[in-house]
Amino acid sequence: MAKKSEKLKKRRRRARRIFLTILILLSVSAFIVRLVAFETYFFSTDAMKPVYRKGDIAVMEKFEMLTENEVERGDVVLCAFESADTRLVRRVWGMPGDLIDVRDNQKFLIYKDDEGVMREKAMGNAPGLVYGTLPENAFLLLSDDLEADADDSRTLGLVYLTDITAEAGMILWPPSRMFRND
């Protein structure tokens, strides 16, 4: 009877050791993956509404080395605005070669869509932008909700390719919105 009890204790200790080893390995692996490939972002405003809302936490897929051809109009990216020493998630609207025009004290982004049709997007006053063509490796990033009082390229200026660090992905929190982007 004592032998069975001793064997049972040894099995439990061994199982506990294996469980702890697996738990530690999984934790270290998750930390490394997060450090290298992903990060999270907390949305503190409704500027990206309706897709991302205030209080959402989303996964950002980090870029290793980004080229101008990998950024597309409509991408939602995490970037560093040097002028404000801040990191924001915003949508790419203006691409290198697009034109910023001024008419009636309003600024407009003039660009060709995917079908080659000329389009324009009104941006209001936009004190951070000046008339002209967007230079190579420069992008115009805007909030989805242009009525929101939020910082973007209209107030902070253009973002350069080297300042774009990640692409927005799935919502982690709240769980009810995890697989929805509406």
Show the residue positions of the predicted features.
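Soluble "head" domains of membrane/secretory-pathway proteins
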Residues: 2-16, 41-42, 49-182
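Hydrophobic membrane-insertion alpha-helices, especially the h-region
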Residues: 17-36
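N-terminal active-site beta-alpha-beta segment that forms phosphate/nucleotide-binding
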Residues: 35-38, 42-43
